[in-house]
């Protein structure tokens, strides 16, 4: 068996950058096809350096994604769609529609990064998942309404609810009990009284 470094992911063998052990014939095929390189000491060192750079880049992208997720959490996403009196949409909301809505608000999100668990065919509130990074999926609320008047009422209600939650959270922090350090507080008078008693005892002696 020969050890090779995979230059691309191969099903059943490993991911790009991983070391795989294969038969000599298969190793020659992978090397000739440019899908792998020999696992020499120098190549292993180069791989380690490349992986370190890739990890740092991934961490940087994750930090940026966390900022985007925080911004998304502060938004109110409202989509206006035509619907019947009973709330059934004339059509449905697709992932591309959600991506377009987010894009109109300045978020660079592709349709393939948006997914939800149910088909949106009615007026209402829905949870939308946005994959910002391989390790981070933001969950946002989407409100589907009939017209601009409903949209404005929804925005105001969401703003009031958030204000109430923030106020409640701030109140809980203020009302949180302060832990007692356990230090005993002794008054000056009691210390003086003890000193006086000690002097009196000494005088008797």
UniProtKB/Swiss-Prot annotation:
Function: Binds to the 23S rRNA.
Stated name of the protein: Large ribosomal subunit protein bL9
GO CC terms, sorted: ribonucleoprotein complex; ribosome
Region (Disordered): 160-205
InterPro entries in the record: Ribosomal_bL9, Ribosomal_bL9/RNase_H1_N, Ribosomal_bL9_bac/chp, Ribosomal_bL9_C, Ribosomal_bL9_C_sf, Ribosomal_bL9_N, Ribosomal_bL9_N_sf
Biased amino acid composition, Low complexity: 184-195
GO molecular function, one term: rRNA binding
Gene3D superfamilies linked: Ribosomal protein L9, C-terminal domain, Ribosomal protein L9, N-terminal domain
UniProt keyword annotation of Ribosomal protein present: yes
Residue spans crossing the bilayer: none
Secretion signal, residue range per the UniProt entry: none
Family designation: Belongs to the bacterial ribosomal protein bL9 family.
Gene name tied to this protein: rplI
BP-aspect Gene Ontology terms: translation
Keywords, ordered alphabetically: Ribonucleoprotein, Ribosomal protein, RNA-binding, rRNA-binding
């Amino acid at each position: 068996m020969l050890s090779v470094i995979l230059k691309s992911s191969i099903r059943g063998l490993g991911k790009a950058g991983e070391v795989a052990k294969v038969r000599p014939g298969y190793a020659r095929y992978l090397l000739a096809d440019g899908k792998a390189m020999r696992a020499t000491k120098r190549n292993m060192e180069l791989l380690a350096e490349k992986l370190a750079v890739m990890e740092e880049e991934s961490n940087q992208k994750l930090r940026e994604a966390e900022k985007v997720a925080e911004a998304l959490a502060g938004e109110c996403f409202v989509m206006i769609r035509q619907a019947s009196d009973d709330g059934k949409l004339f059509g449905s909301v697709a992932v591309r529609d959600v991506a377009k809505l987010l894009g109109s608000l300045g978020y660079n999100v592709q349709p393939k990064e948006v997914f939800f668990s149910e088909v949106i065919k009615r007026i209402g509130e829905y949870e939308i998942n946005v994959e910002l990074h391989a390790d981070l999926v933001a969950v946002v609320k989407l409100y589907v309404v009939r017209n601009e008047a409903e949209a404005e009422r929804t925005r105001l209600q969401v703003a009031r609810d958030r204000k109430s939650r923030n106020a409640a959270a701030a109140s809980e922090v203020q009302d949180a009990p302060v832990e007692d350090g356990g230090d005993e507080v002794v008054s000056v008078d009691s210390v003086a009284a003890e000193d006086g008693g000690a002097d009196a005892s000494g005088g008797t002696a």
